[in-house]
Amino acid sequence: MNRVEEWISQPASRIKVAARADVVVVGGGPAGLSAAIGAARNGVKVILLERYNHLGGLASGGMVLMLDDMWDNHLQEISVRGNMLTLIERMAALGLAVYPRADEWGADPASLDRWTRWGAFDFHTHTKPHPICFAAAFDPDAWKRVALELVQQHGIQLRLHSWFSKTMIEDGKVKGVICNTKEGTEAICAEVVIDATGDLDVAASAGAPFEGGRYMLTTVFRLGGVDTDAAERFEREEPAAFAALDLEVKRILGGSWGLWWLKTPLPGVVWCNCPHMLGLDGISVDDLTTAEIRGRKHIHATVDYVRSKLPGFERCFVVDVAPQTGVRQTRLLQGEYIMTKQDLAERTRFPDSIARGRDYYMPYRVLLPQTVDNLLVAGRHYSATSQAQKMSREIPPCMAMGEAAGVAAALSLQTGVTVRNVDVTALQRILRSQGADPGDQAARNPEIPALARAETVLETA
């Protein structure tokens, strides 16, 4: 039976202008953080709005604790650099991020044995076992800490506990955003707005065309008290018994990737990118509530089972369940160019490429709404088909898009043009000069971050 919709009307109200800036970034996840840094580094005043009490989005609040999709197996190079590598290196310096050294990349048995349970392998390859590659496992609170340090370092005005409500738009041009806070409704005015919400909240509110998308939801969790050495030894020495138990765990979870648990930099703590739940909408309050309730039931049933059956997990306990639901796909921008699965599969290079993912390139046009000016979009809600987005939604390419969007916003203001008319050649040049790889050149990135060469990266964690 269909529910009858009811509506109310509210009188027009005056809204306090809480702040003004050159650029407002809505959403403090990976793309939003990178966008704010990219803009501020290039000399404009930036306000960063975030709904939670921390930065990081799905990286920290969602506890997606593996940074992958930044290694080009065809060219054997690190393909996402810039702000992403800065963040990784700073977390590693704290002993709270680990990744394989350059001499460990590949399918050497010792490397596979050491790194597979960290998730540091190229899961896109068709060969088994998947080769070890450059990928980083990290701690969520390390991300929060380093993100705050970077925001303060670049003079970004941070406004936490600010929920986006509505886009301010006049004559097709975005003028700022309306937020809800504990102090009431507030207006934040800006010359350029960057939508880094993950769900296209700002662009959709402004009337930009989009397509609805849907993919599985996940309530990620961490377990403590795990003897990972014993667990790996059982997996290695009793493969048949392990396979039977592993199959039952996945049945109880209701959905997971091949490896349902992975190591973290914290001793005895593993993270579990599961349970996966299908058929739910990531912007529906009812569906999100269902996911939280259903997910926790799967988690607690799984813990009860592995305590009694799985070597290494006898004394495990739930450390935490991610405070942010793992949403992979909702609204997708239909921008000046729409990325396709074919673009990704064929590794199409574009003249206006401004970011790279694993082995694919992203043109500037995928950040541009069709009908709205002074607005850029960066993150998993970029302009792509549903299938293409599923292949390109990981954190590193989202950070690369964000960095490009931030630099583009600054460049537009400094040259007196709209973001739609930014000189992309100049944008590419700035990105490359500041350590990013916009994908404008086909040459390899031969240099490796200093910490990737170090012998003690893993041992410091």
Describe every region a protein language model picked out.
Residues 1-23:
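Extreme N-terminal leader/targeting segments of oxidoreductases
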Residues 2-4, 20, 45, 51-166:
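Conserved N-terminal/central alpha/beta ligand/cofactor-binding core
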Residues 19-21, 183-192:
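Core beta-strand elements of the Rossmann-like FAD/NAD(P) dinucleotide-binding domain
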Residues 23-46:
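N-terminal Rossmann-like FAD-binding beta1-loop-alpha1 element of flavoenzymes
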Residues 26, 188-198:
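Short hydrophobic core segments
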Residues 104-137, 141-145, 149, 153, ...:
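Mobile, glycine/GP-rich and aromatic-enriched active-site lid/loop segments adjacent to catalytic centers
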Residues 168-187:
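Conserved beta-strand-loop-beta-strand element in the redox core of flavoprotein oxidoreductases
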Residues 195-208:
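Flavin (primarily FAD) binding-site architecture
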